[in-house]
Amino acid sequence: MVLMAPRTLLLLLSGALALTQTWARSHSMRYFYTTMSRPGAGEPRFISVGYVDDTQFVRFDSDDASPREEPRAPWMEREGPKYWDRNTQICKAQAQTERENLRIALRYYNQSEGGSHTMQVMYGCDVGPDGPFLRGYEQHAYDGKDYIALNEDLRSWTAADMAAQITKRKWEAARRAEQRRVYLEGEFVEWLRRYLENGKETLQRADPPKTHMTHHPISDHEATLRCWALGFYPAEITLTWQRDGEDQTQDTELVETRPAGDGTFQKWAAVVVPSGEEQRYTCHVQHEGLPEPLTLRWEPSSQPTVPIVGIVAGLVLLVAVVTGAVVAAVMWRKKSSDRKGGSYSQAASSNSAQGSDVSLTA
């Protein structure tokens, strides 16, 4: 695959910020690339989205009438025209690189160009509460399966199959892991710090959850107790059920945290209980926005109803988010540890706000 040339390192990114700014929690920045072939319908579509914590802040779609990287958060509108022009050019160049990667992957897997195929990339880093680098990561997938990933030490690669081994060998020869490590630990962190400062009113807030419990009879003998947490930010939250003080982890139905449509999140956890024993069960809620954990118990007299309108709105947005994620995020999950290792190719670092150019070509 074609390797992107290294770009000039970022010179100035609010240096004083790195020394003086502190945060109450860890933060992350991640970019997701998705490239999808569509035989007979033109060149593959390329989508790039960037997230700081749980907030999407930039997006690029090659299918737009006039493709440009665009802001997806109000605080990104502070960036001037030169920023968006530069990042748009980077996205367009990356789109061409990813399309070439897709063609090369077809050759590696001995596949024809008549079918639909997908190449996905996710990379980013986490920083601690006071700003230091915690960890970096980069994963690549082909047709929804692991292809190659940067190991935790940021010095080596794990390939998922024999085809990926080809990429791994080329990356090792090019010292690609070292390039990625330097980029993720340095320039990438500086961009994250800049965005955290510019968007601090949004990104560093802590909205506590609004909680309540609902009761849903199943039969004369059983009922479902559902513990709700609504309107919270950030997305990290813990809901646990206890019976007489003992955790009911195995018996708890827990949904993934969902966007509510207004920049906050929703979640619920449920247990099935014997009718008449509801008072023995308690729901415990932990979140950054709470001064201390909450404990909820079913109160028959309150009989709260589920806020259908708010939940439906959240589910509608969830559908949109999931749809976007299918084309813009890495959807594969790590398989069991006994999978064969493999390798995958990657690009040189970039000093742009887009993050780094990631080339899967080899």
From Swiss-Prot:
Q: Name one GO molecular function term.
A: signaling receptor binding
InterPro entries (UniProt xref): Ig-like_dom (IPR007110), Ig-like_dom_sf (IPR036179), Ig-like_fold (IPR013783), Ig/MHC_CS (IPR003006), Ig_C1-set (IPR003597), MHC_class-I_related (IPR050208), MHC_I-like_Ag-recog (IPR011161), MHC_I-like_Ag-recog_sf (IPR037055)
Q: What residue spans carry the region label Connecting peptide?
A: 299-308
Q: Name one GO cellular component term.
A: external side of plasma membrane
Provide the membrane-side ranges marked Cytoplasmic in the record.
Answer: 333-362
**Region of interest called Alpha-2, as start-end residue ranges on this chain:** 115-206
Which stretches are tagged as biased composition: Low complexity? 342-356
Region (Alpha-1) location: 25-114
Where does the record say this protein resides? Cell membrane
Pfam families per UniProt? C1-set (PF07654), MHC_I (PF00129), MHC_I_C (PF06623)
Q: Which gene encodes it?
A: HLA-H
* Domain called Ig-like C1-type: residue spans: 209-297
Name where it mostly resides: membrane
Supply the name of the protein: Putative HLA class I histocompatibility antigen, alpha chain H
